[in-house]
Each structure stands twice: as C-alpha cells, then as structure tokens.
Amino acid sequence: MKSKRVMGIAIGHDEIVGIKAYKIEGTIVLEDVIVQKRHSNKGTDVKEFFEYYGEVGISIGCVFESSLQSVYMETPMMHKIDQYLFAHREGKRIFQNEDFPNAIDFASRPGTTEELMCMLIVALERKQVKQVAQGIQQGGGDLRVIDYWPAPLAFSRGRESSMLCITPEEDKVQVSLWNDKFCTAHTLVSLDVNEVLEACKTVYEDSKQFQVPYPKGAIVVGFDETRSKAFESILETYGTIDQVPLHIVDKGEDYNPQNINHEMAYGLAIRLLADGK
C-alpha cells in the first residue's frame, strides 16, 4: 500500500533542498529532488521556494542550518504539563540569549529506572523559526514539523541504537552522540582530527550515565573532500553507518548522498513518513 507523499526541506547557507518521497510496502521511494540557490533571508527564500515548487496537500518538514543547542538529562517522572513547564524553565535558563531569544521544545522517554525519565530540551532562535514557518505557510505549504540541525541524520542513518555524528558548524566541528533519535551529548571542537577523536570519547563517557551503548558507528558528513579524507581515521576507529535504503524514481536521480543538505531533507522525509504526518 502506498503512503501519502511528504516533502522534507533543508535550508543550508547557500541552498534550499527539497525532497519528495513516499513509502510503499515498507520501502522509502524518493521521487523528486529540488534545489534552489539562496539569495535573501530564510523566510523570503523559503516562501519563493514554495511558490515555485510547493503543492497542495503534501505534508512538510523543515530544518535549517544552525548551532546545536540541546541538553539531555534524567529527572524524576513528571506528568506532561509538568514536563512542559520544567523544559521551558530550564531551557530559558540554560540557553538564555537576550540578543536572540530562543524557542524551546522538548521530548521525553523512560529513564534508567521506573521512577525516572529522560528529557531532551532543544533551543532554536525564535526569529528564525518564525521566518521559516511564515515563509512556508505564505507559500502555501502544510507545515507539520520544524526540526533542529543535525537531528534528521538520526533518521537517515537511524538503524543503530547508538551512533556518533560529526558535522561542520561554522569553522569548527560538532561531535554528537545519538541514542534512538535522541542527542544525549555533544561538544564543539576544532578541525584537528585528534581533537575530534577525543571528543568522540568524551560524548560517549558523558552518555554512559544514561545507559547508552557504545557507538555502533559514525557519520562524517558536510565536509569538503580534503577534510573528509583527513577524518577517515574516525570511521576506521568506530565504523561507518550507511543511509537507510531507498528506491529512487523519476527526478529522485538527482539525490546526492554526499551533500549534507540532501541528506537532511531525506532524513526529514523519513521522519514524516514514520510519524504518519
């Protein structure tokens, strides 16, 4: 049986990538890849993108390139309303920024005992979230989710319970550990491969308190060819994690698995299909 079609959108510094996909008999089918160069702010660019390439009735997920602001913690079990109040209070305290106010979101799951729960609190710059949401809606898009960078990689490579993610963030490297779609620890380091390897150890050590298993592999994506080659020792140490299998048809042939914006959009499409949105 064929699912409804969805569209994942990734807004990078230089381009917007849209991927249209659906699921049939458990297989992800990628049918279209749309790329548009950026020239203005996020809201204007994404509005124009949807005016040209949007369509009525398709569910939209969006992610835009930004600094990773998240914290993972274990707390006593709380009801949903108390989780909401706690997450917003702690999120504002941890990620307080008077110049660029943040929007706070959270997710929770069972903790290491029946009395505890784990909570992931995430912050995104409120102005950018508003720009993107308004741009999509003004362009006629049916927006279902705005995700945080680089969370969609946990879906595009999400077959393992624990994995390292190494991505660029401005002139540094963001090293994060992901456990069943939750970012349990992250740290920002220089481009030096030895620092990155040490950071991989650090995020795992920080995550052991939550009973996160040893990483089953690593993702290195978003770097140029020279830097990717320099980081090969990371993959040799931890192993590689391939993208979730997909079937490509029609204009989906333009999909570039080495392009981080393409993969982010693909990961969002997988999330939308998994959520049934």
Where are the model-predicted features located?
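Short glycine-rich phosphate-binding loop at a beta-alpha junction
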Residues: E55-S70, Q211-R227, L246
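Glycine-rich phosphate-binding/hydrolytic loop that grips phosphoryl groups
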Residues: P245-K277
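Internal amphipathic helical hairpin motif
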Residues: F64-M119
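Short, aromatic/basic amphipathic alpha-helical patches
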Residues: R227-T240
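Early-domain small/polar-rich strand-loop-helix modules and first-structured segments
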Residues: M1-Q69
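Small-residue (GG/TT-enriched) beta-loop-alpha framework at ligand/catalytic clefts
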Residues: R5-K20, E25, L30, E114-G217
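General beta-strand structural signal in soluble alpha/beta enzymes
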Residues: C62, N102-I104, L143-Y148
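Switch/connector loops and helix/strand junctions flanking conserved nucleotide-binding motifs
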Residues: I28, Q69-M73, S228-F231
